[in-house]
């Protein structure tokens, strides 16, 4: 089987763990390594790729800055350390990417931001705008306010959620190990690297060892969980050794890693979810011109809406019907029912006047819209 090549992916999420970013002995950033990684990111960026970074390290950096003793931290201590570390982490990424003329935008999220639909849409829109502006979003779990999430390995799963949210076609988990082995390689010298996983089966899950370092809360188990999230959403994933300099270039050169493949693509998987998994909360009836536009792949604008029915919140699924009441499709609406009713039939510039805020130009963005049927639904 021929494996994918890095050059063929257009939108990439790179997850960097604490054990890679921070020198455990000195408690400081591995500056030379990070500069090399930033150069790799800049190379992808120059080639026209959209690149996002999910970076751990805020608690570890905060511990160092505050000179806290080694050992476990209580919840409130972890949160306070994260508050200090987040400032340092943002500055570090801004500097290393800025050296290549790339702007960095910090986004702090929790799992709730990726699962509650209104917050999900806000975060997704922010990421999309940063990418449109050719900035690199640097995303970290908001450990200052998170509770149960401040625990071992969540940034692996968070990275998968971010990749799904951003419709990325590749998630790279940089680790302190080459990939998934048939057994934990430290304990078993006969363990073999698995170069490709086409489906996360029970057998694959059983191979997940407990590779963990003092600074990292991650392990192979959470990486397998991340793979399930990513591949279900149409995102390929790979695990590669990040301890070497220029780890992304090593992947591009065919270096050792484990690929987790998916037969779907992010847009198809997302639309399958919208079409088959969400209960519509209302209905938008649109005019004939809007029907033609939607079938041509356009977004639904307020001007094309002639009637709003139901009680729905921003981010809810709604049905879209033509003037003859025939169902055209369904999608995630960018306004609640009250505001949608106010701006129906109006041009996008009128939204600011009517609502007092600029709002979204689309009632439903085309990426959040399913017209007709989706394969597999």
From Swiss-Prot:
**Which InterPro entries does the entry mention?**
AceGlu_kinase-like_sf (IPR036393), Asp/Glu/Uridylate_kinase (IPR001048), G5K_ProB (IPR041739), Glu/AcGlu_kinase (IPR001057), Glu_5kinase (IPR011529), Glu_5kinase/COase_Synthase (IPR005715), Glutamate_5-kinase_CS (IPR019797), PUA (IPR002478)
Report a single Gene Ontology molecular function. ATP binding
Q: Which residues bind ATP?
A: 15, 175-176
A biological process (GO) of this protein is: L-proline biosynthetic process
Where's it mainly located? cytoplasm
Residues bound to substrate are 56, 143, 155
UniProt-listed Enzyme Commission number(s): 2.7.2.11
Name of the protein = Glutamate 5-kinase
The source organism is Rhodopseudomonas palustris (strain BisA53)
């Amino acid at each position: 089987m021929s494996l994918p090549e890095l050059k063929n992916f257009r939108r990439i999420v790179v997850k960097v763990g604490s054990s890679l970013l921070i020198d455990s002995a000195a408690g400081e950033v591995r500056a030379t390594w990070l500069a090399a990684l930033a150069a790799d990111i800049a190379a992808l960026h120059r080639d026209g790729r959209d690149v996002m970074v999910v970076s751990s390290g805020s608690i570890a950096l905060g511990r160092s800055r505050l000179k806290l003793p080694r050992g476990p931290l209580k919840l409130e201590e972890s949160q306070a350390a994260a508050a200090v570390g987040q400032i340092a982490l943002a500055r570090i990424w801004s500097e290393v990417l800025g050296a290549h003329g790339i702007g960095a935008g910090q986004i702090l999220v929790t799992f709730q931001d990726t699962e509650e639909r209104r917050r999900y849409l806000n975060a997704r829109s922010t990421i999309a705008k940063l990418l449109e502006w050719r900035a690199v979003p640097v995303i970290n779990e908001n450990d200052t306010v998170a509770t149960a999430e401040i625990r071992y390995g969540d940034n692996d799963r968070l990275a998968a959620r971010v990749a799904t949210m951003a419709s990325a076609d590749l998630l790279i988990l940089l680790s302190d190990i080459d990939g998934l082995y048939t057994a934990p390689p430290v304990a078993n010298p006969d363990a073999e690297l698995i170069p490709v996983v086409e489906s996360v089966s029970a057998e694959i899950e059983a191979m997940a060892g407990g590779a963990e370092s003092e600074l990292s809360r991650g392990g192979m188990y959470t990486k397998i969980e991340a793979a399930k999230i990513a591949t279900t959403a149409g995102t390929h994933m790979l695990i590669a050794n990040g301890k070497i300099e220029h780890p992304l270039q090593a992947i591009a050169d065919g270096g050792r890693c484990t690929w987790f493949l998916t037969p779907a693509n992010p847009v198809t998987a997302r639309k399958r979810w919208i079409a088959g998994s969400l209960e519509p909360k209302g209905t938008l009836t649109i005019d004939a011109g809007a029907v033609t536009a939607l079938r041509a792949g356009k977004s639904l604008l307020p001007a094309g809406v002639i009637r709003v029915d139901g009680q729905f919140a921003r981010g809810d699924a709604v049905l879209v019907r033509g003037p003859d009441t025939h169902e055209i499709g369904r999608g995630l609406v960018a306004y609640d029912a009250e505001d949608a009713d106010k701006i129906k039939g109006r041009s996008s510039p009128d939204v600011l006047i009517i609502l007092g805020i600029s709002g979204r130009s689309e009632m439903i963005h085309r990426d959040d819209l399913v017209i007709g049927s989706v394969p597999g639904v």
